[in-house]
A protein has these predicted regions:
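A short, conserved beta-to-alpha structural element at the edge of catalytic cores
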Residues: 29-34, 85-115
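Secondary-structure transition/capping motifs at alpha-helix termini
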Residues: 52-60, 84-94, 125-130, 152-168
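Conserved thiamine diphosphate
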Residues: 19, 55-64, 104, 108-156
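Acidic, glycine-rich active-site loops and adjacent beta-strand->loop/helix elements
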Residues: 68-75, 98-104, 137-140
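Terminal amphipathic helices with adjacent charged low-complexity linkers/tails
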Residues: 171-177
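Residue-level marker for buried hydrophobic side chains located in beta-strands
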Residues: 64-67, 96, 174
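Cofactor-binding active-site loop characterized by glycine-rich and histidine/acidic residues
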Residues: 1-89
């Protein structure tokens, strides 16, 4: 479904593994790319591989939202340097949203603790990201945060074009808690 009902189902189903009475997936929009995931073009294989590619996936004029997991963020760290090589001239904006739910497949994550998340945010800032925390249980917060991320990056690209900033630009990074 569309609207609030649809976004609520997406958020509730993200880690759903229930099987319906007929044997089908009760939550077809789970945490992994599958035939029910419209627009899902990469899962990454091992945790974090999608993070290494999302920054250059959108072409100029396109936009991409990359939903990432805190478990993946603890695995592959090459994407930490995306602000160093993202360029508005050859790529559309990419907006990473990390779902900080403290889970990595069947384990807990370090980022599942307040100390771990605060440390990760400091790390992101040091790598050139601009972390934005928001309530990951509120669908409206996702919309507002994506809008804010887009506004911040557009403003920075404009400032770069006006000679106020230079590359690397701070890349907004949403953290859904």
């Amino acid at each position: 479904g569309n609207g609030e009902e649809g976004i609520n189902r997406l958020l509730n189903d993200f880690y759903g593994y229930e099987i319906a009475a007929d044997g089908s997936m009760a939550a077809p929009l789970g945490s992994h790319v599958n035939p029910h995931t419209a627009g899902g073009i990469i899962e990454g294989g091992y945790l974090g591989f999608a993070e290494l590619q999302y920054a250059h996936m959108p072409l100029p004029g396109e936009k991409l939202v990359a939903f990432l997991s805190d478990g993946a963020a603890e695995e592959q760290r090459g994407s930490d340097w995306i602000p160093r090589w993202w360029r508005a001239e050859d790529s559309g904006p990419a907006f990473p949203i990390m779902i900080a739910n403290g889970r990595r497949i069947e384990q807990r994550t370090q980022m599942g603790t307040p100390e771990g998340l605060a440390s990760f945010e400091r790390h992101l800032r040091g790598c050139g990201f601009d972390p934005i925390e928001f309530d990951g249980r509120d669908p409206a917060a996702f919309v507002c945060t994506l809008w804010e991320m887009e506004q911040r990056l557009e403003r920075r690209v404009q400032e770069k074009n006006n000679g106020i900033l230079s590359y690397p630009l701070p890349i907004p990074y949403g953290i859904a808690q």
